Amino acid sequence: MVRALLYLPDDAAPPLAAAPVAGRTLAVRVMVAALRAGASQIAVPSRLRDAEVERTLLRMPALAAAVHWLTPGVPVSAEERAPWLLLPASSLIHVSALAPLLAAPAPRGAVLAPSAAGPAPVALVPPPLVAELWTDLAAGRPVGAQLARRLVEAGAEARETTGPYVAVRVASDLAQAEQALEVTLGIAADSGVDRYLHRRGSRWISRLLVRTPVTPNQVSLVSLVIGLAAIWCFWHATAVSAWLGVLVYVLACIVDHADGEIARLTFQESRLGANLDWTIDTIIQVGIVLSLGVSSGGRLMGLVGLLGATGVTLSAVFARYLPREIEVGPTIGGVLAHIANRDLFYLVLVSFAALRWLAPSCVFVVAVVVAVGSQAYWVGCLARIRRPRP
């Protein structure tokens, strides 16, 4: 168990702690990082209590329950022996940057290596050290230089980190902090097209919308509208509308990426949002696959499109709800893990548009390939489920 305490490193810290970075103030970001790092209690000088903090606490009950406001003269708790995680309120500290500090005990204290040489150390310290500085910590007076000196005297262990950390000392450092945050916006499931196309576009949208009251779910609904426009372009597609459909689908994907980025940047992640995002992605892909069959002409190809749409739906359901070890097991291999990603889907759409333009009579080939290929993922998962476990 660990306790966290936000402190002010110097006289310039209070306005910087209240400065917004990607839609949330630095002080709020530090509080959330402490909560997500596992802090059971987050002590915060009442000097940092402002309207933005209060709004965040209303939106995040778990954070509100963990935060304890410190006032001048409040006594330090002498009973608890849990170490303190000291966090400068005017720095950008991502939760992933705190992992090395909390990975192992530190009897003499530990300090985040990138912060060790500066006046705003991020440190895990034993209770006696906090007791020495408690009067100033509780009153919200600057303690950065004094803390840095005591850590050196105590022989605190410097621990490296790869997580984002930026010491914001002047207002011009806020831009660097925002850039560091953007590095964290990708997710493990991102494909090559996601990283090099969608994320590049979505970050422009996210930068704008995090400064507005727009919610991630509202952005998701916009991506649905754009996706429906892409489906319309592929339905009974012409050479022109097929290529237009590809471009509209690109825009839908960019907006779809922005909703998750906004949610992560503003701490609005939710189960509802995740389910809505998955549902919209599935609707768009299913609709486009069905459109490919309809555009190929004839009742038979319409049925082929319906078969492909069914396969996409089943694959999406299996990928969403199966345990990871079943969804992608060693016997299925990496191929099925990537069979439904957007890179492959783009290849399908571009192939369809090219054939509609250059060889219209051959577009049915794409619909047939999709109808057969879309079954591979869910059939592979089903085979793994039915296979006896060792």
Task: Name each model-derived stretch.
Residues 216-272, 363-369:
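Membrane-embedded alpha-helical segments that form the functional core of polytopic membrane enzymes
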Residues 1-52:
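N-terminal glycine-rich phosphate-binding loop and ensuing alpha1 helix
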Residues 72-73, 266-272, 327-328:
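Juxtamembrane helix-boundary/capping and inter-helix hinge elements in multi-pass membrane proteins
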Residues 203-211, 260, 264, 274, ...:
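Short amphipathic alpha-helical coupling elements at transmembrane boundaries
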Residues 7-11, 44-49, 87-91, 115, ...:
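Structural motif
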Residues 188-233, 237:
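Conserved small-residue-rich
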Residues 58-120:
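Conserved beta-loop-beta/alpha segment of the NTase-like Rossmann-fold superfamily
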Residues 118-205, 278-390:
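A feature for the membrane-embedded catalytic helix bundles of lipid/isoprenoid biosynthetic enzymes
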